[in-house]
């Protein structure tokens, strides 16, 4: 009798434990952990993922090009990427769909240290450093046209992701591709007074800098929607407690406790999407047309093929 009771209790415990186990979800970041990922880190800090019944594994990539392709291959549930890349993936026919937004404004800027450069019109005859061909060239050309100058009058110099150092060394007069919350802050901490031109202020359609993609066949899985709910809780807590959440983040990642990361954390707080699930359809369609007009995609892909709003 006792043996039967013990066996029954053991089975009950096993089944109860199984029922209470959190569902695993793998999220691959776009880059190493940094302040741009604050709501994700905060959601983890405050237990928002566990409250949704999720066991979220946050993975920095070995190669920044891999995360979306890992999702396309069903090797991860979600990946952080950039809205422009989502359009390129759709053009390639990859089964990736934007399901959420982390940062819902561009971070890209043109930055100059020369006091004579105040607007894109002042870039005529100047050297501008860049790192990513195609999209940054089209962005700069649009800004130049908006300012009434010939894009060909600007000399582009590939600085291989050394934007700040190229600017400080005087190799270029300005750079495009620096983030307003990172490179601009880095220059200020070095005692410089950078001129920062936000791309969306000069004719470039606004877009979401960082977004979350899932495999097309998985977008209606409950855990995707639960992740977004937890992420929204992370954003809310971060907004209410920016300094407290920074201290918790820095304690968990002491190697990232620098003044630059602290300033970037605080500067980025207002830029996170209040509702990560919300989709601005017109914004995506306008940016798709922008890419097509600049011959960066072969065709105009219908929005429903690459972006959804789950709740």
Which stretches of residues belong to each language-model region?
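Bacterial N-terminal signal peptides that target proteins for export
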Residues: 1-7
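Bacterial N-terminal signal peptides
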Residues: 7-16
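Sec/Tat signal peptide C-region and signal peptidase I cleavage site
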Residues: 17-21
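Short, glycine-/small- and polar/acidic-enriched structural segments
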Residues: 24-159, 164-169, 173-181, 196, ...
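Short helix-capping segments at alpha-helix termini
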Residues: 48-51, 146-151, 190-192, 222, ...
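Pocket-lining segment of extracytoplasmic ligand-binding domains
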Residues: 84-85, 162-252
